[in-house]
Amino acid sequence: LNIDRITVDSKAFWNNDGIDIDGCRDVIIRNCDVESGDDACCFKGASERNTERVLIENCRLYSCCNALKVGTDTQGDFRDVLVRNCQIGGVEYDPSGLKHRCSDSGVSLEMVDGGTLENFLIENITIDRAWSPFFLRLEDRGRVKPGDPKPPVGTLRRIAISHVRGGD
């Protein structure tokens, strides 16, 4: 999957993600400009397949919620993700009127349904207008399909963050 040079403006409603990645392999997202009413770029794990080998680079990801998010739907695993050379943070205008020029977090990693996030590298990013530049959450929120065993607490493994700058 190759997404290159797209513009997404989905701020009209509070629950609009910009780009969702669920159960995909060999993904490249580059040179994109996303502004969303919810998460700008979100990895989800509802699919039977794991998400693997993802590159996000040279993108502008702005949100009324989380600019870059893994979760909260994390029944699957996420491996080998590189995010580099991006600007992320809060949108200038929140149409809901609930927030002023700010996202909840720049990067949110929320493993709450038993999944694992591993080999995740973030480098050379700028975070603007975020209440929390990074938000990490490990939990078992008790989300179980009928007949399935209770999942364990989620796992973060080999997470690396380097060369992060703060903006306004």
Language model region names:
Residues 1-168:
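Extracellular/periplasmic carbohydrate-active domains that bind, remodel
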